[in-house]
Amino acid sequence: MKTVSTKSALAAAVKAARAAGKIMRDNWLKPKRVNSAEAHDIKLELDVRCQKLITKILFAAFPKISLLGEEGDAGDADADYRWVVDPIDGTVNYFFGMPHACVSIALQSKSDKWRVASDKKNTRRRAQNLLTPHSSHITILGVIYDPFTDELWTATRGGKTKLNGRVVRVSERAQIGEAVVAMGFSKSKENLEKSLPHLIRLARSALKIRLMGSAALELAYVASGRLDLYVERTINLWDIAAGALMVECSGGECYTLPAPGGKLRMCADNGLLRKKLQLGSLLK
């Protein structure tokens, strides 16, 4: 497959994110049909409906690009490019009427062109770049849309992260006592037990701790300097693919490690805090 125009792909992703965001906004306070309810999680019919709309828009623009999504995959799994989609990140918040949820869309490539360019530009961060140490794909653009605030974050590899068209950067806070830190909690007993001691330690040392329930938005907030660090022990690729690129493109770092079941361990920060916090046991 020939090289995809990032400008055209970004435009398609923005269109799809806004369309799905409109569905979210229009149905926010209406009764919602639950497809499944598991321990600590909810799956909505609206998740499926939003992903179907996103898929339709993206495939109309790029029919040969595959899609990996929270609500299922589409297209040729061996394609050189793939979309990575979370149609509603923060579904539990959304279901309970809390306006903290978003649409997250990333485009990834297998091409070594992007990997080489990324490594040359980010030699200092080479070990931190999202998935480059342990994946055949590299994220080349990301879009996150919050339909409740009408905030749209965009990033393309090698460029700057933008919020509603304006460049944003990570914070410059270097002391944990000045930092606002967010954590996410996975659903297994083991991961909860490993995460809680770190939550207590961070709560004692950080300025404030936040548990906000949307990994994509937390990463967008790190990229914008609203949060200083976000950490989660077990998370899916579609939750973080777009946001991790945004953190990197705004001057921060996103450190990931593979976890069981195809999941990831992740810590994103402004580039000044992670190594000071000794989070190694949380990410193992």
Question: Which positions does each model-derived feature cover?
Answer:
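Anionic-ligand binding region
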Residues: 159, 163-168, 194-201
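DPxDG-like acidic metal-binding loop motif
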Residues: 78-115, 125, 129, 134-162, ...
